Design a protein with these regions (language model features):
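Membrane-helix entry/capping segments
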Residues: 3-6, 11, 15, 19, ...
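Intracellular coupling helices
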Residues: 6-14, 18, 22, 26, ...
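Generic structural signal for small/hydrophobic residues in well-ordered secondary structure
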Residues: 13, 23, 44, 60, ...
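Hydrophobic alpha-helical transmembrane segments of multi-pass inner-membrane transport and secretion
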Residues: 15-42, 265-300, 327-328, 332, ...
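Membrane-proximal extracellular/periplasmic loop immediately following the first transmembrane helix
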Residues: 37-102, 203, 207-215, 224-228, ...
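C-terminal transmembrane helical bundles of large multi-pass transporters
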Residues: 625-706, 710, 721
Length: 773
């Protein structure tokens, strides 16, 4: 019997091959996107959750408004001792220095790339590092290291690494291996291959180069600890300084405070998972609409099967077999798609796991989706078949596809499709606006910088000899990426209420006319600083004017540590950070001519690669092992929008699939409708209706559905996008033409999808049609 059901199901899929193909492709893409995105979400949410007491482990960071969301992972090496002495809630605290970049090591002239972490003795006990071989106490000295068992196998094979030497290529230091330790049991922000002893060459509260981790006692009030660490005093060199420490749970650190190397933020992954789920729903609705329509077309056949002894369960199994077969085919194609895109997905998601890890989870998710789909479809098909099976068994169906399920399905698919297209276009418009706007305060196109070089290289002379370099600027830190941070607190300024305890934190920046001309900095009020002004004249940005509450800022006085400064001008806000973060108030001074900072230069269009290679070649002439950090400001700024750009690309693909499902669904349903309404069309032609009237009859029905779906999709899309745009400082307007273009475009696509089928039906000879009926 099952074999018979499969034959019938397969023949129906072949008979309606266009509709079946659209459903299979749509569901395959939906299954793939949904399964991978759910896997991705689960992976992101399980970072650093495998330690003992993982829910009680926190990272103590610092606040930098020019860095990401203002939370940095770094802190002073003094902080660990302060926490241990002054915070009774803390059970254990440790210091580490994590090298976020992979480094090279040598073993007998063979190079290996590894991840390194410097740790103190508390780290070993706090994270229960297990020693598999060697020194069980693991008190690392200056020239000693420990490696993981995986690294030991990679470098030494089956030989024991204890007592062997490795050379750190960066510093050319030789280290002796004293222990082999167990790797992390799960994925971590601080994954490592080598453990080195922690050492801070310049410990002070202002030097924030390490990461401080601590574990609190169970049932402690973490909010009270956060409040206490938000503002406290520290002492150094006989002086007291205000300090502030931010803390965040280690298990959610990657999602709550993502670093710049995270490709896609967790909230964007969740959004994509929801959208993928909607694509699956669209595909299933599209197929179920056609399946239920065909059930009602086959009601005489089903009634005859019932009369001849078929049970209700047997009929339900017959009808569900086609759906299950379609879902299995979709799943198979989905698995093929996963195999094709897996390398790209692994790179994008930064999931460094074996192939089996992906397929096991994906298979579970797909089976779950199939089970839920079949369960829902069983209830729906049983309900529809009960209403149609025994009613009017001897009458031929005059179904005109005007049932509630049909209209609801088309409305839902059009609603989702229009909303997808609208949201995707707004996102792409916003992304294009942010990447090309002049509202960021500085010109970054074709601007490069030598951020750091370990050797004394005459870059000025080198750049002057390059015809592709149009101009250069020295003595300033590169604004993007921001490599130099300095802030100070202002407690007194002109216009402040005498009884107020308000203060304002300002960024300490430098500027002059040369800098303003180079970057195109716009002066809004007053004038730019001049060398003749002296050291008491400053300019401030728009954010500082707002913070001080001034309406006429030029000429106002600011007191900094007992010294008075006069505001000479106001410049446009300069965005050093991602556009989702507000610009901090800043005060700009003349440069002190100490020669600090790198060198910034402009290149001709399309010559960045040539210029950068020439600079690297010149540095290699001085020292082949020299460290050089070159920066292209436009490329760096584009990385700030990496997550949004990736989301837009994913949404574009999903939106296309969703629209294709809706359009081909309409095409398929029109095909079935024309087949059902052949007699009606023939009678209308006999009564004088031309092809235009018949075409208008169909198009008007779908146009009304388009109007209704647009009526709900556009307002919802506007509310969602308005809320999303509020995350950005600079926002693109949502203009009226977006609505018009989407509505007209969808109407045109619907018209094209129905015209051919209706035209073909209208061209048939009425006499032949009526004879066949």
């Amino acid at each position: 019997m099952i074999k018979h059901y499969l034959k019938v199901a397969f023949r129906n899929l072949i008979k309606y091959k266009t509709q079946s193909l659209v459903s299979i492709i749509g569901l395959a893409v939906g299954f793939t996107c949904f399964a991978l995105s759910v896997l991705w979400i689960r992976y992101e949410m399980t970072y650093d959750n495998f330690y003992e007491g993982a829910d009680r482990i926190y990272l103590a960071g610092s606040s930098f408004r020019l860095y990401g969301d203002g939370f940095t992972y770094n802190s002073s090496s003094f902080l660990a001792d302060y926490l241990a002495k002054n915070c009774p809630e803390i059970e254990k605290v440790c210091r580490i220095f994590y090298d976020w970049n992979e480094k090279k090591i040598k073993n007998e002239d063979v190079e290996f790339v590894v991840r390194r972490i410097e740790v103190d003795s508390n780290f070993i006990s706090m994270f229960n590092i297990k020693v598999l071989d060697g020194d069980n106490h693991l008190q690392l000295k200056k020239d000693e290291i420990a490696i993981t068992e995986n690294t030991a196998k990679r470098i030494f094979g089956k030989e024991s690494p204890i007592g062997k030497h490795l050379i750190l290529e960066e510093s050319n230091e030789e280290k002796i291996i004293v222990a082999v330790v167990k790797s992390w049991e799960g994925h971590s922000l601080f994954s490592f291959d080598i453990l080195l002893p922690f050492h801070d060459t310049n410990p002070n509260w202002g030097n924030q180069r390490c990461q401080t981790l601590f574990r609190i006692y169970p049932n402690c009030d973490i909010e009270a600890l956060k409040q206490r660490l938000s503002e406290y005093e520290v002492q150094q060199d006989g002086h007291k300084y205000p300090n502030s420490t931010l803390i965040a749970p280690l298990s959610t650190l990657r999602s709550s405070h993502p670093r710049e190397d995270v490709n896609v933020k967790l909230n964007h992954i969740r959004l994509f998972a929801c959208i993928s789920g909607l694509v699956i729903i669209c595909g299933i609705c599209n197929y179920l609409t056609m399946l239920i329509t065909r059930i009602r077309m086959r009601k005489r056949e089903l009634a005859l099967r019932k009369v001849n002894g078929s049970s209700n369960g047997g009929l339900l199994t017959l009808l569900l077999t086609e759906l299950v077969l379609l879902l299995i085919l979709s799943s198979g194609i989905g698995l093929v798609l996963i195999e094709l895109i897996l390398p790209t997905f692994k790179r994008l998601s930064q999931i460094n796991e074996g192939v089996s890890f992906f397929y096991i989870e994906v298979f579970v998710y797909i089976l779950s989706l199939i089970a839920v789909t079949v369960g829902f479809a069983s209830l729906l098909i049983r309900y529809i078949s009960k209403r149609t099976l025994l009613s009017n068994i001897n009458k031929k169906s005059n179904l005109h596809l005007s049932g509630w399920f049909y209209k609801s399905s088309i409305l839902f698919q059009l609603f989702i499709g229009i909303a997808f297209v609208f949201c995707t276009l707004v996102m792409m418009k916003q992304l294009n606006f942010l990447l090309n706007t002049k509202e960021l305060g500085i010109e970054r196109h074709n601007v490069g910088a030598v951020v750091y070089c370990s050797e004394n290289v005459p870059f000025k002379e080198i750049l002057e000899q390059m015809p592709d370099v149009t101009k250069y600027l020295s003595g300033f830190q590169t604004p993007i990426p921001k490599m130099y941070f300095s802030t100070f607190r202002i407690k007194e300024w002109e216009g402040k209420a005498t009884d107020s305890e308000q203060y304002i934190d300002l960024e300490d920046e430098t500027i002059n006319q040369e800098y303003a001309d180079f970057f195109g900095v716009e002066v809004l009020e007053g004038s730019m600083l001049d060398e003749k002004d002296g050291k008491n004249m400053v300019v401030i940005n728009e954010a500082a004017v707002k913070a001080f509450g001034w309406t006429q800022p030029v000429g106002k006085k600011i007191d900094k540590l007992g010294r008075h400064y006069i505001v000479k001008g106001v410049i446009k806000n300069i965005s050093y950070n991602a556009p989702i973060h507000p610009v901090a108030p800043a005060m700009f001074f003349l440069p002190d001519n100490t020669g600090r900072g790198g060198i910034i230069f402009k290149v001709k269009e399309g010559t960045w690669n040539v210029v950068s290679e020439k600079i690297k070649a010149e540095v290699n002439k001085v020292n082949p092992n020299a460290e050089l950090m070159l920066s292209n400001m436009e490329e760096v700024y584009d990385t700030y929008m990496k997550s949004e750009r990736t989301l837009c690309q994913l949404l574009s693909i999903v939106s296309f699939i969703c629209i294709a499902i809706a359009v081909f669904g309409i095409f398929s349903l029109v095909t079935l409708s024309c087949q059902q309404r052949r007699k009606e069309i023939a009678i209308r032609k006999v009564n004088g209706a031309n092809i235009g009237i018949i075409l208008n009859l169909f198009f008007r029905e779908y146009l009304l559905l388009l109007v209704f779906s647009s009526f709900f999709a556009f307002p919802l899309g506007y509310v969602m996008m308005k809320h999303w745009l509020e995350n950005y400082i600079k926002q693109t307007p949502i203009e009226w033409w977006l609505y018009a273009v989407i509505f007209i475009g969808m109407g045109f696509v619907i018209f094209l999808s129905i015209i051919w089928r209706v035209w073909k039906a209208a061209q048939q000879n009425p006499a032949e049609v009526l004879k066949g009926e």
